[in-house]
């Protein structure tokens, strides 16, 4: 299958799924990386800019460069993107889990806890506004 067909099929599947559950728009985290950039493009193609809500959710492992990339992506796509820090929420988890897991803050578990904090924020927004959360992940998550 060629890449354009694959992309079109993914956009159609995403649209069918969200519309099938009665979604009134989508929310996603914008990290500035390839995965969230591709998914943001798919969401805009499926739902239009007015129905895509992006959030930059920096934490202790985030770089300023990634936030600049996320802002540029949002600007290029014509979607609004808000910045909400998850640093305080992460610190609460870190303080509790560090008692159970040595070197928690320097581990994959620590980095992935940052992703879980982001998911909590995105799910809360989705539930509150009636949006559908669209998420990305990789093998380590």
Q: Which positions does each model-derived feature cover?
A:
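RNA-binding accessory domains that recognize and position tRNA/RNA substrates
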Residues: 1-27, 45
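A conserved beta-strand->alpha-helix junction
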Residues: 51-56, 64-106, 115, 140
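Structured core elements
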Residues: 27-29, 38, 53-56, 80-85, ...
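Nucleotide-activated chemistry modules centered on ATP-dependent adenylation/adenylyltransferase
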Residues: 7, 23, 89-141
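Aromatic/hydrophobic pocket-lining residues that form π-stacking "cages" and hydrophobic walls in ligand
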Residues: 14, 70, 122
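ATP-dependent adenylation/pyrophosphate-handling site
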Residues: 24-30, 34-71
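Residue-level signal for inorganic ion chemistry
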Residues: 33, 74, 134
């Amino acid at each position: 299958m060629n890449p354009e067909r694959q992309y079109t099929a993914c956009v159609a599947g995403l649209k069918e799924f969200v519309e099938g559950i009665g979604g009134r728009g989508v929310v996603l985290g914008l990290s500035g990386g390839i995965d969230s950039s591709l998914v943001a493009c798919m969401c805009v193609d499926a739902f239009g800019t007015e129905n895509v809500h992006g959030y930059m959710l920096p934490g202790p492992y985030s770089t300023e460069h990634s936030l600049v990339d996320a802002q540029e992506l949002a600007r290029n796509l014509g979607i609004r993107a808000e910045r909400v820090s998850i640093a305080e929420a992460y610190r609460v988890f870190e303080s509790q889990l560090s008692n159970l897991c040595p070197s928690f803050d320097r581990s994959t578990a620590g980095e992935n806890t940052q992703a879980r904090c982001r998911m909590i924020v995105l799910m809360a927004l989705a539930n509150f506004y009636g949006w559908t959360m669209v998420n990305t992940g990789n093998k380590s998550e």
